[in-house]
């Protein structure tokens, strides 16, 4: 009887300890508002397409681990809102979008609430495209996260001169 009770208590303790463990990487909740603190491209982005100002990105977690992403940008004197779904793959931190033409890798940094989002694929079916963003849950500068982003750039064989730090706007407002 004592051994049965001890077994039940032990199983209960294991269940409690398992519940307290951090979730695996593929269960990270990316929902919320994100700010692009720095960006890099693989050299295929023309200078006139480099944004001087960026706005917060909204991510909503969907069923099956997919992410609905809303990006707001300034284009030809107007605010444009663009929504797309990042489809979760079997590989943790890897998503596809735009009918599998783009692959997005999400990499955690050692800095709390900072991730690197790197999108690669074909642009208009022709040239290879790659862009990375250091994203944080707040808009403040973080030198440690920036240093990790620079190391990411080197690791990906990208050029530091293709890195830029855009101004972060609170929200896109059209002027009259």
UniProtKB/Swiss-Prot annotation:
* Signal peptide start and end residues: 1-19
Q: Which UniProt keywords apply?
A: Disulfide bond, Glycoprotein, Secreted, Signal, Transport
Cellular component (GO) terms are: extracellular space
> According to the record, which residues are glycosylated?
42, 124
Q: Which CDD domains match?
A: lipocalin_1_3_4_13-like
Reported tissue expression? Expressed in the liver (at protein level). Expressed in epididymis.
Give this protein's Gene Ontology molecular function annotations. small molecule binding
* Pfam families to which the protein is assigned, alphabetical: Lipocalin
Positions of disulphide bridges = 79-172
- Which residue stretches, if any, does this entry annotate as coiled coil? none
- Predominant place of localization: secreted
Compartment(s) of residence: Secreted
Q: Which GO terms describe its biological process?
A: glucose homeostasis; insulin receptor signaling pathway; negative regulation of gluconeogenesis; negative regulation of lipid biosynthetic process; positive regulation of fatty acid beta-oxidation; regulation of glucose metabolic process
Task: Report further notes.
Answer: May be involved in the development of hepatic steatosis during obesity.
- Family membership noted in the UniProt record: Belongs to the calycin superfamily. Lipocalin family.
The protein's job, in short, is: Involved in the regulation of systematic glucose homeostasis and insulin sensitivity. Involved in the regulation of liver lipid levels by positive regulation of hepatic lipogenesis and negative regulation of fatty acid beta-oxidation; via downstream transcriptional regulation of CPT1A and hepatic lipogenic program gene expression. May regulate hepatic lipogenesis and fatty acid beta-oxidation in an autocrine or paracrine manner.
Q: What is this protein's record name? A: Odorant-binding protein 2a
